[in-house]
């Protein structure tokens, strides 16, 4: 098994990337400046993702109306149809973006998901979790609010 390499760590600036929503709307990493962003990479078939994503959806439901909060949930390597079906099955309301060729993911790491990054207004990663978050949705909201 190859060693996990984190290309982006705490205190690093977000790399430049662009992702598309299922409707084709582009989001560029520069668009996140000035906001507090929770960035999440997942795959619909990953057990750890299935455990962590409901927490992320809870955070979204609690924080979505905050004007400077952004949630960028990125599906690694799956089609819109696959993610839509998974979202429906899980009753998620949070938005998602697609990384069909894993190009964006490869800027952050070579393997291991889910990955959760908390990013401040200057687009600097202030906290990250790989595989397991070990935080409840409420604790994660606390972390987000601390840096807003």
Residue spans for each PLM region:
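N-proximal helix/coil linker or "cap" segments that precede and/or mark the start of modular domains
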Residues: 1-16, 33
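A short beta-strand-turn-helix
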Residues: 17-37
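Short pre-active-site segment immediately N-terminal to redox-active cysteine/selenocysteine motifs
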Residues: 35-37, 42-45, 112
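Hydrophobic beta-strand anchors of alpha/beta hydrolase catalytic cores
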Residues: 38-39, 71, 116
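Conserved redox-active cysteine motifs that mediate thiol-disulfide chemistry
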Residues: 41-58
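Thiol-based oxidoreductase modules, predominantly thioredoxin-like and allied folds used
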Residues: 67-80, 92-102
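Short, internal strand/loop/helix patches
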Residues: 84-121
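Thiol-/selenol-based redox modules, centered on thioredoxin-like
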Residues: 118-148
């Amino acid at each position: 098994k190859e060693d996990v390499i984190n290309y982006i760590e705490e205190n690093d600036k977000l790399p430049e990337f662009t992702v598309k929503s299922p409707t084709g709307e582009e989001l560029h990493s520069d668009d996140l400046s000035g906001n507090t962003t929770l960035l999440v990479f997942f795959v619909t078939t990953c057990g750890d993702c299935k455990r962590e994503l409901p927490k992320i959806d809870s955070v979204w439901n609690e924080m979505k109306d905050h004007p400077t909060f952004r949630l960028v949930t990125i599906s690694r390597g799956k089609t819109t149809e696959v993610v839509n079906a998974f979202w429906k099955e899980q009753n998620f309301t949070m938005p998602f973006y697609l990384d069909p060729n894993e190009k964006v993911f490869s800027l952050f790491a070579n393997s291991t998901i889910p990955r959760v990054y908390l990013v401040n207004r200057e687009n600097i990663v202030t906290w990250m979790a790989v595989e397991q978050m070990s935080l409840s949705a409420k604790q994660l909201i606390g972390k987000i609010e601390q840096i807003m």
